[in-house]
């Protein structure tokens, strides 16, 4: 995608110290907060190398001037960040989704982007999940919600 000039948009997931004071939340959300997943002390802190908030080392070479890192989402979807705004301001109407949690974050991003009027395709083999059942559930839902669900190889072939 980068080689063909496509922009990459990243919707990061960060929790800050002040988020530990939330008065309620779902079980998955509480697990993430309790385990300090995606944790940074505050918005102005550099990401600690190797922390849950850091980018995977193999992907870091792709972070460049054609990579737009949105403001962070907090729970699962992009409703609390500026992903849709960034996509629209860059003239994007079609999105190819990939990500680490198919049945929660990828699914939530898919649904919100579709509801916001974007064409959304999912690279199914570029998503992960906490177990096969969760992955299978996500793939089933992608088939109902996404414009298309396909392999990464098919995505690259069609770019």
Stretch-by-stretch model annotation:
Residues 11, 123-125, 152:
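Generic beta-sheet signal
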Residues 70, 147-158:
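Short acidic-hydrophobic, aromatic-tinged amphipathic segments that line or gate anion-handling sites
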Residues 96-100, 116-132:
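A short glycine-rich beta-strand->turn/loop micro-motif centered on a GG-aromatic cluster
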Residues 131-143:
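Active-site-proximal loop->helix
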């Amino acid at each position: 995608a980068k080689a063909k000039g496509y922009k990459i948009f990243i919707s990061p997931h960060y929790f800050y110290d002040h988020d530990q004071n939330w008065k309620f939340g779902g079980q998955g959300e509480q697990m993430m907060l309790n385990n300090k997943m995606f944790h940074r002390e505050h918005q102005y802190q550099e990401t600690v190398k190797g922390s849950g908030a850091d980018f995977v080392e193999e992907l870091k070479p792709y972070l460049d001037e054609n990579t737009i890192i949105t403001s962070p989402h907090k729970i699962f979807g992009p409703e609390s960040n500026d992903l849709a705004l960034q996509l629209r301001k860059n003239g994007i109407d079609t999105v190819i989704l990939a990500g680490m949690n198919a049945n929660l974050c990828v699914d939530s991003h898919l649904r919100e982007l579709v509801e916001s009027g974007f064409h959304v395709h999912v690279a199914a083999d570029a998503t992960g999940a906490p177990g096969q059942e969760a992955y299978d559930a996500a793939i089933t839902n992608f088939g109902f919600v996404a414009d298309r669900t396909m392999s990464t190889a098919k995505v690259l072939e069609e770019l």
